[in-house]
Amino acid sequence: MDKIINAVETNYKKEDIPEIRPGDTVRVNVKVVEGEGEKKRERIQPFEGIVIKIRGAGLGRSFTVRKMGADRVGVERIFPFHSPSISSIEVLKKGKTRRAKLYYLRDVKGKIRIKERKD
């Protein structure tokens, strides 16, 4: 059974995914389709924030990015690593954390400070 799953997954896996850990500041460029029919247009929309969670394995692996929007409203988006709608993922800063899930950042008001990792 595992051989069949691995054979199917190899067709859909992306190879150009950078190493991401919780606490990293990333910019995810997402392909957004606007309009319908002949007015259909595709553009790239960046989403920049801190990775607060990574879950799963294989094709089902995903990560959650949190950013502070207008009026200090927190916005979270969940991205599958191997999604065809993700154009690229850039790691802007590497964060040093002691937790795998950074849910406590949801309660923090104002600017979030995470120490930088030196790799």
Swiss-Prot record:
Extent of the signal sequence: none
Keywords: Ribonucleoprotein, Ribosomal protein
Pfam families, sorted: Ribosomal_L19
Residues spanning the membrane: none
A GO MF label: structural constituent of ribosome
Gene Ontology biological process: translation
A GO cellular-component term linked to this record: cytosolic large ribosomal subunit
InterPro entries named in the record: Ribosomal_bL19 (IPR001857), Ribosomal_bL19_CS (IPR018257), Ribosomal_bL19_sf (IPR038657), Translation_prot_SH3-like_sf (IPR008991)
Role of this protein: This protein is located at the 30S-50S ribosomal subunit interface and may play a role in the structure and function of the aminoacyl-tRNA binding site.
Cross-referenced HAMAP family: Ribosomal_bL19
PANTHER family documented for this protein: LARGE RIBOSOMAL SUBUNIT PROTEIN BL19M, RIBOSOMAL PROTEIN L19
Family, as annotated: Belongs to the bacterial ribosomal protein bL19 family.
Name this protein carries in UniProt: Large ribosomal subunit protein bL19
Lineage, uppermost ranks: Bacteria, Thermotogati, Thermotogota, Thermotogae, Petrotogales
Gene from which the chain derives: rplS
